[in-house]
């Protein structure tokens, strides 16, 4: 095989390795984001039982707490 052919094959191999590494990094970042979302939700759910009961009595949704008091609304934004 000529020197030019070897260089082309080597370049293609490096390009393949670089794109595979990028894809793995993106997948890992996506998994990390999913874990962070799960952690946030579990923390929020634990403290919201009292808020949910308080707002359910008023036929509204619990939107979190403001200054330690449950904040209820028909629809929660953010």
Curated annotation (Swiss-Prot):
What is the name of the protein in this document? Conotoxin TsMSGL-12
Please report the propeptide residues according to the UniProt annotation: 25-44
Q: Which residues form the signal peptide?
A: 1-24
Expressing tissues: Expressed by the venom duct.
Q: What is known of its domains?
A: The presence of a 'disulfide through disulfide knot' structurally defines this protein as a knottin. The cysteine framework is VI/VII (C-C-CC-C-C).
- Specify whether Coiled coil is a keyword of the entry: no
Family label: Belongs to the conotoxin O3 superfamily.
Q: Where in the cell is it found?
A: Secreted
Q: Which cysteines are joined by disulfide bonds?
A: 51-63, 55-72, 62-76
Primary location group: secreted
Taxonomic source organism: Conus tessulatus (Tessellate cone)
Q: Which residues carry this modification: Phenylalanine amide?
A: 77
A single GO CC term for this protein reads: extracellular region
MF (Gene Ontology): ion channel inhibitor activity; toxin activity
Which keywords are on file for this protein? Answer: Amidation, Cleavage on pair of basic residues, Disulfide bond, Knottin, Neurotoxin, Secreted, Signal, Toxin
């Amino acid at each position: 095989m000529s020197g030019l052919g070897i260089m082309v094959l080597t370049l293609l191999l490096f390009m393949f390795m670089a794109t595979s590494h990028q894809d793995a990094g993106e997948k890992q970042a996506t998994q990390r984001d999913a874990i962070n979302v799960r952690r946030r939700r579990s923390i929020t759910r634990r403290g919201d039982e009292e808020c949910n009961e308080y707002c359910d009595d008023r036929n509204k949704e619990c939107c979190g707490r403001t200054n330690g008091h449950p904040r209820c609304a028909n629809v929660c934004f953010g």
